[in-house]
């Protein structure tokens, strides 16, 4: 019986086995789906239903960077328990997987699973005996010698970061590499979610605005009860909301206040820029928390990360800006299952 791509896809969906193993199973079993599934399970390749339902939120990250800093790769592989994550077999799997991704640059996890390495990965998982998942990875490459790349992996192998910057010259790129490692260390600690405020989803910003304003209002109710100074309630939380119209309106309001205070119009030009900058600062809290370029740089609290990189490039007579970064932290965003042992025992006794 001819084995079609659709059959392989269906078997893959029902067993979570690599594509090549699914095809081999179907060929061996003459296209019989049930027999092919059994064939995979006998060899420990197919995920059992019980194992598939378990949560893999522990694990390690892998990190590899070229000797000439032209390319770097980060990988996250999850296990169910930290005990397995510290196993030599698991550590070796992370190392091998990182090297494979670094060398072959697969498009995504599914693409890697469909290769011969996917079969190797599955066999390694069977030996380890726990649910293991290759969750995500990213490789950043330099298009030319004017792109600087560096990265950092934390000592516990649970956080890894890569940062790249576009520079005006090879000289600037080489000089900036140590700085980029510091930026990567900054990102590992400060947990930015995006490169710039421009990367925020509009709906996310809107929802965050409503939520944050409501939180501040509730906090102010308690502060008022305690007769303490109230917090400022912003109109906005991100630069992406501060359109030309919004800023013009804010500037007009500042001038109206100065006029009401009787300040001479001749000195407004000296006052307005500072107050407008304060308005922007008060209304961009989301950017300062979650956008890498707008975060306060941990090694110089007078500069943002973006400004610090520009300053470092300027010191060597060049220009530079961060254009990409990736930060992987083990288990980030995965909801861990908390077992209620008493409830489990009660259920078994009922």
From Swiss-Prot:
Keywords: Cytoplasm, Elongation factor, Protein biosynthesis
Involved in Mg(2+) ion dislocation from EF-Tu, as annotated region: 81-84
Sequence similarity: Belongs to the EF-Ts family.
Any one Pfam family match given in the protein's UniProt record, by short name: EF_TS
Ranges in a coiled coil: none
Cell location: Cytoplasm
Keyword Cell membrane: no
UniProt protein name: Elongation factor Ts
Principal location listed in the UniProt entry: cytoplasm
UniProt superkingdom: Bacteria
Chain's gene name: tsf
Cellular component GO terms, alphabetical: cytoplasm
InterPro entries: EF-Ts_dimer_sf, Transl_elong_EFTs/EF1B, Transl_elong_EFTs/EF1B_dimer, Transl_elong_Ts_CS, UBA-like_sf
GO molecular function: translation elongation factor activity
């Amino acid at each position: 019986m001819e084995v079609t791509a659709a059959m392989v896809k269906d078997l893959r969906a029902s067993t979570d086995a690599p594509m090549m193993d699914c095809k081999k199973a179907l060929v061996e079993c003459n296209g019989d789906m049930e027999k092919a599934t059994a064939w995979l399970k006998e060899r420990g390749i197919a995920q059992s239903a019980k194992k598939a339902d378990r949560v893999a939120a522990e694990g390690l990250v892998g990190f590899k960077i070229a000797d000439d800093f032209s390319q770097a790769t980060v990988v996250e592989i999850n296990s169910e328990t930290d005990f397995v994550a510290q196993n030599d077999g698991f550590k070796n799997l992370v190392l091998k997987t990182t090297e494979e991704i670094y060398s072959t640059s697969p498009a995504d996890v599914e693409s890697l699973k469909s290769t011969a390495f996917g079969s190797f990965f599955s066999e390694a998982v069977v030996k380890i005996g726990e649910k293991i998942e290759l969750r995500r990875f990213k490789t950043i490459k330099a298009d030319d010698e004017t792109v600087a790349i560096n990265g950092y992996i934390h000592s516990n192998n649970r956080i890894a970061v890569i940062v790249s910057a576009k520079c005006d010259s090879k000289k600037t790129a080489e000089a900036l590499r140590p700085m980029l490692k510091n930026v990567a260390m900054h990102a590992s600690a400060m947990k930015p979610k995006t490169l710039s405020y421009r990367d925020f989803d509009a709906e996310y910003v809107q929802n965050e605005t409503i939520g944050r304003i409501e939180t501040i209002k509730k906090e102010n109710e308690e502060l008022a009860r305690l007769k303490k100074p109230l917090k400022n309630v912003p109109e906005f939380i991100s630069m992406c909301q501060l359109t030309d119209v919004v800023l013009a309106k804010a500037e007009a309001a500042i001038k109206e206040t100065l006029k009401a205070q009787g300040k001479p119009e001749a000195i407004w030009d000296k006052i307005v820029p500072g107050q407008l900058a304060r308005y922007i600062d008060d209304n961009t809290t989301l950017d300062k928390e979650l956008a890498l370029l707008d975060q306060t740089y941990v090694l110089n609290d007078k500069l943002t990360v973006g400004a610090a990189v520009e300053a470092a490039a300027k010191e060597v007579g060049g220009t530079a800006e961060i254009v990409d970064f990736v930060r992987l932290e083990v288990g980030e965003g995965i909801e861990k299952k908390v077992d209620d042992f008493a409830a489990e025992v009660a259920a078994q006794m009922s």
